From Swiss-Prot:
A Pfam family of this chain: V-ATPase_C
Expression (tissue specificity): Expressed in brain (at protein level).
Keyword check for Ion transport: yes
One term under GO cellular component: plasma membrane
Residues where N-acetylthreonine is found: T2
Annotated keywords: Acetylation, Cytoplasmic vesicle, Hydrogen ion transport, Ion transport, Membrane, Synapse, Transport
Subcellular location: Cytoplasmic vesicle, Secretory vesicle, Synaptic vesicle membrane; Cytoplasmic vesicle, Clathrin-coated vesicle membrane
Quaternary structure annotation from Swiss-Prot or TrEMBL: V-ATPase is a heteromultimeric enzyme made up of two complexes: the ATP-hydrolytic V1 complex and the proton translocation V0 complex. The V1 complex consists of three catalytic AB heterodimers that form a heterohexamer, three peripheral stalks each consisting of EG heterodimers, one central rotor including subunits D and F, and the regulatory subunits C and H. The proton translocation complex V0 consists of the proton transport subunit a, a ring of proteolipid subunits c9c'', rotary subunit d, subunits e and f, and the accessory subunits ATP6AP1/Ac45 and ATP6AP2/PRR.
Function: Subunit of the V1 complex of vacuolar(H+)-ATPase (V-ATPase), a multisubunit enzyme composed of a peripheral complex (V1) that hydrolyzes ATP and a membrane integral complex (V0) that translocates protons. V-ATPase is responsible for acidifying and maintaining the pH of intracellular compartments and in some cell types, is targeted to the plasma membrane, where it is responsible for acidifying the extracellular environment. Subunit C is necessary for the assembly of the catalytic sector of the enzyme and is likely to have a specific function in its catalytic activity.
Protein name as it appears in the record: V-type proton ATPase subunit C 1
Bilayer topology: Peripheral membrane protein
Length: 382
């Protein structure tokens, strides 16, 4: 299960006691969750007004950064065109898997110096992730165009004889070329009607060259045949052929055009291969950057919310729980019993779906302790 609950509770005599109490209640005694301390450094608190405003801004930033993390992960899956396991291998944070990164979280002092104000740190994160989002849009657009153009050409060379490009199938010898009077047509003949074609093609119109038809290719349902006739009989031949379920394809043998199409396909294929490696590398690096930023936003939110709820001086313990799916309800009840004394408004039914005025959270998401969910299930496989 890739869901974490990031919570905080006020320090008792010491923060260590708070941690030991939670660990005993959730992990040690009954194995409801895997629990670990979540280390948040001593950040600059600032004024109450700033904290209240920042609380709303961080909620928006959290949603934005999570969206970018998911976009980068999903695009990685699209680019790799591969199995879920292969994608997961590439979704790392700081070179380790996501669970390891979260459970061993250490604040990045170099990226987000704690001497800066909370607002400045949130702005540094917002700026960095916005840049990733913009870069992703432009890189994805360029790669998707390339991929789309290549797929269009590949699609032309696939499908039935009625629709696919015939350039790869026919040869110069299959045509009478450079004749003032004669022309070679390509006709798709249903296999069920092939005997009728053999008997009729010479008489479908005047001036058809006898014994000029050969089978050039076939698919599941049809044969591709050529036939040579005088140019002035072409319209009449087309009309009569259609009446007999023989379809004349619009095709002119042009070596220059065919060569250009082939070169274009080779060029697009080469370009795609050239771009693939650097793009995957960029996605790996920037997924890591965005994910790290996201967990720092979660840390900021816990810090700000804990100060707003539990007051000053700063005295709280942040803790990370990885719940067992089958015992999530029981875990909620245990946490409620541990911390219900913190907030009388949460003493109602734990999961009542009621709105609390002045809060962005419904009652379902409001608990007497600070709580944020981290969902690492980032991919939506179709």
């Amino acid at each position: 299960m890739t869901e974490f609950w990031l919570i905080s509770a006020p320090g008792e005599k010491t923060c260590q006691q708070t941690w030991e109490k939670l660990h005993a209640a959730t992990t040690k005694n009954n194995n409801l969750a895997v629990s670990s301390k979540f280390n948040i450094p001593d950040l600059k608190v600032g004024t109450l007004d700033v904290l209240v405003g920042l609380s709303d801004e961080l909620a928006k930033l959290d949603a934005f950064v999570e969206g970018v993390v998911k976009k980068v992960a999903q695009y990685m899956a699209d680019v790799l065109e591969d199995s879920k396991d292969k994608v997961q291998e590439n979704l790392l944070a700081n070179g380790v898997d996501l669970v390891t990164y979260i459970t061993r979280f250490q604040w990045d002092m170099a990226k987000y110096p704690i001497k800066q104000s909370l607002k400045n740190i949130s702005e540094i994160i917002a700026k960095g992730v916005t840049q990733i989002d913009n870069d992703l849009k432009s890189r994805a657009s360029a790669y998707n165009n390339l991929k789309g153009n290549l797929q269009n050409l590949e699609r032309k060379n696939a499908g039935s004889l009625l629709t696919r490009s015939l350039a790869e199938i026919v040869k110069k010898d299959d045509f009478v070329l450079d004749s003032e009077y004669l022309v070679t047509l390509l006709v798709v003949v249903p296999k069920l009607n092939h005997n009728d074609w053999i008997k009729q093609y010479e008489t479908l119109a005047e001036m058809v060259v006898p014994r000029s038809s050969n089978v050039l290719s076939e698919d599941q349902d049809s044969y591709l045949c050529n036939v040579t006739l005088f140019r002035k009989a072409v319209d009449d031949f087309r009309h009569k052929a259609r009446e007999n379920k023989f379809i004349v394809r619009d095709f002119q043998y042009n070596e220059e055009e065919m060569k250009a199409d082939k070169e274009e396909m080779n060029r697009l294929s080469t370009d795609k291969k050239k771009q693939f490696g650097p793009l995957v590398r960029w996605l790996k690096v920037n997924f890591s950057e965005a994910f790290i930023a996201w967990i720092h936003v979660k840390a900021l939110r816990v810090f700000v919310e804990s100060v707003l709820r539990y007051g000053l001086p700063v005295n709280f313990q942040a803790m990370l729980l990885q719940p067992n799916k089958k015992t999530m309800k029981k875990l909620r009840e245990v946490l409620y019993e541990l911390y219900k004394h913190l907030d009388s408004s949460a003493a109602a039914i734990i999961d009542a779906p009621m709105d609390i005025p002045g809060l962005n959270l419904s009652q379902q998401e409001y608990y007497p302790y600070v709580y944020y969910k981290i969902d690492c299930n980032l991919l939506e496989f179709k």
